[in-house]
Amino acid sequence: MKIFRKASELEPNLVSIKDKGQSIGLVLTMGNLHDGHLSLIREAQLHNEFVICSIFINPTQFNNENDFNSYPKTIDEDISKLENIGCNLLFLPEVQEIYPKGLAKKKIVNNFRNILCDKFRPGHFDGVTSVVDLFFNMIKPTNSYFGEKDFQQVKIIQDLVKINHHNIKIIQCPSVRDKMGMSLSSRNSKFSNDQLKIFDVLGNCLLYTSDAADETTGV
């Protein structure tokens, strides 16, 4: 697996790939990779001749500096997982590489805003769409893969593509869940054992309610 940290190193390889007529599948991540991320890589491998994964903890999508600073970082393990799964290329830039003129974000998408996650994390999706826009302009993938776990994010990025990147196809992939039914997330490691026990109970209650509703006629 090739690893590049600078756009200037990445660009000649992208030119070579595209000159060969190969399709590019892109999976954008912030690292601390889990089976959910790897499922996106596998899906990209099924439908593309070349797969790129990026790892970049984007500071402009965090509302809290402590949250940014404490975000899990497991780069050695991440590289090993990507090599084992057969990812072709890892783009691993530093903040200065992506934001050479300083941190900046802009509002690109207006739909699906002021509700759900965006209501409680103002500016978060401006940071997300700004960095995704930068990566799409840099890499110009054929397809890019996102998990359904981040439903609002997927919808907003689909709108971003309609506005700025008409040739990129956004592929929405099913969430991968743990044995308790919780969607895998890099932040799950922050939960305490007591919090996980509460989720286990709530998850079972939701499953029971769903099964009961399915069995009830007229619901």
Language-model-detected regions and their locations in the chain:
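Nucleotidyltransferase catalytic core that binds NTPs
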Residues: 1-210
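Single conserved hydrophobic/aromatic residue that forms the stacking wall/gate
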Residues: 208-219
